[in-house]
Amino acid sequence: MLPGEHLEEAAVREVEEETGVSTEFESLVCFRHWHGYRYGKSDIYFVSRLKPLSNQITIQEEEIAECLWMPVADFLGSNSIHVFNKTIVTAALNSPGVSPITIEGYEPAERFEFFMPPGAIVGN
């Protein structure tokens, strides 16, 4: 993430940089924290649901080896896809995820990020 960048902005930017696909952020589907992942450092992993605004893929070869569109059933049925990734896709299909919201009293908005499920705002 870039300094001052929110998660939703980073997700949209990273996908466009690495695949050439323009997207719109919809929700956060998954968050994973892995203690001591590499070099004794933690790894934080976010997965977002994004709506594609374009479909032409242009791979940034320094970052990724392969990128393609495929039917969800093929993805979930593939023996080469790790169970963690299948679990994330299943969660995205079965849950609306959590979306960015603003909460009164937390200003300026540039300093705060809140992600909540639909209908979670109280008293705004």
Where are these regions (language model features)?
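The catalytic Nudix box helix
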Residues: 1-28, 48
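Nudix hydrolase/Nudix homology domain
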Residues: 3, 61-124
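Generic structural "secondary-structure junction" signal
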Residues: 3, 9, 31-33, 59, ...
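Extracytoplasmic/secreted proteins and extracellular or luminal domains
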Residues: 21, 40-41, 60-63
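Acidic/polar loop patches that form or flank catalytic/metal-binding clefts of enzymes
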Residues: 26, 57-59
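Hydrophobic/anchoring residues in structured secondary elements
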Residues: 28-30, 69
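Active-site-adjacent beta-strand/loop module that shapes the phosphate/pyrophosphate-binding cleft
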Residues: 33-57, 72, 88-96
